[in-house]
Each structure stands twice: as C-alpha cells, then as structure tokens.
C-alpha cells in the first residue's frame, strides 16, 4: 500500500502532488477559480492506501497544458487503487441517449469494471461496495432539478450511509447558479427526475446540494452520509461560468444550458427541442406548425438515436440568439400550447414530474400562466 512504500516512492507521490498543485495555481492565475478536481493536494491524502470507486462520466476532467485529463486516468497514474467506476445516465463516456439503458461493462481504455447506475438499478448494492473504502463523486451538474445526476448522487449517498463508506464530492460551479426559480417539487410528483422538494432551478453547486441532502435528512430512514466536499475556491455564483465541454450529449453549448430549464418541459409534449439536430435545446417545433417560417429536420445521430419527429420537417422557433436568461421563461410553452390543434394530447402523463406539480398544466390549460 502507498503509505508503506519505500521512501523513494513516497517522494514520487510528494512530487506528483506538488506538480498538480502547480497546475492548480496556473488555473487560478487564468480565471481565479479552482474547482474540486484541481485540488489534488486536498483529496489525494484522503484516498492513499484505500480502495476507491469513482462515480463519474466524461465531464470528470481538468485541463493541463491545454489538454483534457480524466479523473480516473489521473488517479491511476498516481497509483491510487481505483477498483471500479459507477456510471450515471448517458454512461461513463457520456455518449448515450437520454433515457437509454446502460449495461455493466469493462472500460476498454483502463480495464476497469463499469457499473451502471441508470436503468433498472440506480443505487450501488452492498456487493458493489464490497472492499471499497471511499467513493469519489465528480460530475458536472447544470443546476436544473430534472437533470438526473442529482438523483444518482442521492442514491450513492444513501448506499454509502448504509455501508459505512465515506463519499468525497469534488465540487464544480453551477452554470445556472445565478438564479433560483420554478415551483418546488410536490411529493406526489417526485421521481428520478426530481427526488427533493426544491425549485426547478436551485442555484447551488452539486457539493452544496450534497450537504443539503444530508442536512435535510432526505436519505432513507434519516441516514447520514459520511461526506467530504472538496470545495471551489473563488467561486462567484453571480458570474457566468462557461463550460468547456458538453455536460451531456444534447446540451452542446452555453446557450442550450441556459435555455434547458425553460425548454425541458417540452420533453413531455409533442414539441421537439432539436434532439437529432446540431441545435439541441436551442430550437422548438413540430411538423404541424406550418405557419412558422423557421424549420429543422431531426435525424438519428449519436446521442439521439430516435429523436422526436425523426425525418419530418418541423416548423417553429430558433432560440439561438435569445437573451441570457435569469429566470424560467414559460412564454414558449404557452405559445406552443396555443398553437397546438389537438390540445387534449399536448401534455403527456409525465409532464407533472418535470413541472414538479400538476398545477402548472392546469394553469396553462385555463390561460392563467
């Protein structure tokens, strides 16, 4: 084990820790913000000589010499005993469709077992955690309640609490952290796209949210997870935080991330949000709105194998140049409902799970929103 290594290997670890510290200081010089993953000097001593599992996807990365390095690769190079990876929605490599079932597999690059936490199984079992001492959670969130990584973190925390395992969350800024808006989730509407009584946009980082899960006793039987958050340094939630990578296959840029809390409602309507195009969550339309000039045609592509209205021309709106939002904007949802010919079939059965209650649907139907 690392703590029992000879002096020469201890020196190597010391050098590596300080090398990563230099990288972090360079990041501070660039934008004055240090995120959790960059603070190797804080979390590496907590995991040396321990068996580690990691909950991550493609967003678990940092930049060194203008190159992106994944957390798993970084820790393996530091001789950390990474035993397995738990994968959330979209998979470990982040290239699977929304809602697509993920199966257990072996990562071809590292040879590590990948255990799915999306599909029939959403929570690590006691067997999964056998001989695991610590779990590290590092996934980029976008600050919207229906983004399922929060629910994955909830169940990981619950499993850690049940099996007396420490959880380390490497915190990351929230790109929609500059506002709080939307109805608080009602108990009868809770599901995997919303497990907690919070607004749609909650303004917290994922590390802050993890602390709230513990503090509010939201885990089963009021369990408490042994939680350590590697916090962000020099984070200002009122400043725009631009991601340098897609947090998921259908959020390709900052505009889509900013529009996502306002457009995700359409996922439970007949309206396309551009899945199967290059403008995901930046356009809306259906084949039946022929009075609109703008059009797009969804096609099957990686991350959107069977998009809504596949191969049909959809007419609607291009929202690429909409002003940056600091609130949820319902005007597009209301407009879509007014333009829908078959209003009885506009809202699908799962709409209330996205909205957080059944009231919003009724208000729109009655013209009260």
Feature map (PLM): residue ranges:
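Glycine-rich oxoanion-binding loops at beta->alpha junctions
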Residues: 103-132, 144
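Conserved anion/nucleotide-ligand pocket segment
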Residues: 190-262
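Short internal beta-strands
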Residues: 81-90, 170
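Conserved functional hotspot residues or short segments at active or partner-binding sites
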Residues: 279-369
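Glycine/threonine-rich flexible loop motifs
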Residues: 141-153
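Glycine-rich, aromatic-lined ligand/substrate-binding cores of catalytic
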Residues: 233-310
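Glycine-rich, charge-decorated loop segments at or immediately adjacent to ligand/cofactor-binding or catalytic sites
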Residues: 93-99, 168-190
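Bacterial Sec-dependent N-terminal signal peptides
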Residues: 1-32
């Amino acid at each position: 084990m690392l703590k029992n290594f000879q002096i020469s290997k201890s020196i190597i670890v010391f050098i590596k820790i300080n090398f990563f510290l230099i990288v972090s200081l360079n990041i501070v010089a660039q934008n004055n913000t240090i995120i959790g993953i960059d603070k190797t000097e804080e979390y590496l001593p907590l995991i040396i000589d321990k068996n580690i599992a990691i909950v991550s996807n493609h967003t678990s990365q940092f930049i060194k010499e203008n190159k992106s390095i994944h957390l798993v690769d970084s820790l393996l190079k530091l001789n950390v005993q990474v035993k397995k990876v738990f994968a959330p929605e979209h998979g470990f490599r982040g290239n699977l469709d929304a809602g697509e079932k993920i199966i257990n597999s072996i990562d071809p690059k590292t040879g590590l077992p990948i255990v799915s936490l999306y599909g029939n199984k959403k929570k690590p079992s006691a067997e999964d955690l056998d001989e695991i001492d610590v779990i590290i959670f590092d996934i980029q969130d976008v600050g919207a309640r229906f983004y399922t990584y929060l629910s994955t973190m909830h169940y990981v925390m619950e499993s850690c609490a049940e099996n007396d395992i420490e959880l380390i969350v490497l915190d990351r800024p929230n790109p929609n952290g500059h506002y709080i808006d939307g109805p608080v989730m009602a108990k009868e509407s809770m599901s995997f796209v919303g497990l907690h009584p919070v607004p749609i946009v909650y303004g917290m980082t994922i590390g802050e949210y993890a602390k709230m899960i513990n503090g509010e006793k939201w885990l089963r039987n009021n369990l408490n997870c042994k939680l350590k958050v590697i916090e962000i340094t020099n984070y200002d939630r009122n400043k725009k935080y631009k991601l340098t990578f897609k947090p998921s296959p259908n959020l390709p840029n900052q505009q889509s991330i900013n529009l996502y809390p306002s457009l995700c409602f359409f996922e439970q309507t007949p309206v396309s949000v551009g899945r199967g195009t290059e403008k995901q969550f930046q356009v809306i339309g259906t084949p039946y709105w022929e009075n609109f000039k703008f059009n797009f045609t969804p096609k099957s592509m990686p991350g959107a194998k069977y998009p809504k209205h596949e191969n049909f021309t959809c007419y609607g709106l291009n929202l690429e140049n909409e002003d940056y939002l600091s609130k949820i904007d319902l005007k597009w949802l209301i407009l879509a409902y007014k333009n829908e010919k078959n209003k009885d079939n506009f809202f699908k059965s799962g709409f209330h799970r996205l909205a957080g209650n059944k009231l919003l649907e009724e208000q729109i139907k009655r013209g009260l929103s």
